[in-house]
Amino acid sequence: MKTLRHLSVLLLLLAVGGVCMACYSSKDLKAHGKRVTVTRDVGYFSKVDASGSVDIEFVQGKEQAMRIVGSKQLVDNIVVEKKGETLYVSHKSNSVISFFDDDVTLYIYSPDLTEVNLRGSCTFDVKGALDTDNLKVSVMGSGEADFDSIVCDAINFEVRGSGDIGAKRIDTKNAVANVFGSGDLDFDFLKADNVQFTVSGSGDLDAMLSQVKTMQLNVVGSGDMDIKAQNCGVANCTSAGSGSITLSGTMRDVVKNVTGSGDIDTSNLRAVLK
């Protein structure tokens, strides 16, 4: 019996040791040591493509520049490449970033920004005003993109997964925004001629719309859409599934199309302008 007990203990120790060796062989990177700042010359870019768990802050400026701030080990693990007008940001292969320590922040500057693609858990924060022709933003995974102020001709925002896109103010002509999955889209104030919003899945879209002439609002699945309107035109609303569309404020007319157990709520429309 004593021999059997000793054998069991030995097997347990070997198993634990194997797990520990596996953990240490996975290149788990943790922040330690003093923080460093590294400046890189990246040349002109107007598009950003990021993957992994990097935090990025963007400021529109006259010239392009980049600096990376974090612990030396994590900063050295960041890979930055430019192909054409696209700036690619990622981690070195087979490395795992620890979320329990300081992370890495990239501060980038460029006179133009027309496209942002995020994959993984990256964050992209645009500080101050952004003035551009067209802006396309895609978040795949659990990442997040935030904007202070956007002035442009057209926007196209898309969330796939559980990520988020938010904007405090947008002035544009045409706005397209889609949520596929459980993510969120939030527009504190959006002024446009035409908007087309779709929620497919269990996600949410909240927007304050001003002086929008035509609105195409679609919910497919169990998601929710909350629209507050200021002096808007016609809203064509479709709910297919168990989701809901809630409208409040002032608009000229509403066209409803409900398929399933969903709902299009117009009880909080204070007035319908004719």
Which role fits each region the language model picked out?
Residues 167-274:
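Short, surface-exposed interaction patches in beta-rich subdomains
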Residues 141, 161, 181:
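Conserved G/P- and acidic residue-centered "switch" motifs that form tight phosphate/ATP-binding loops
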Residues 2-9, 18-140, 146-158, 166-176, ...:
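Acidic (Asp/Glu) and glycine-rich low-complexity loops/linkers
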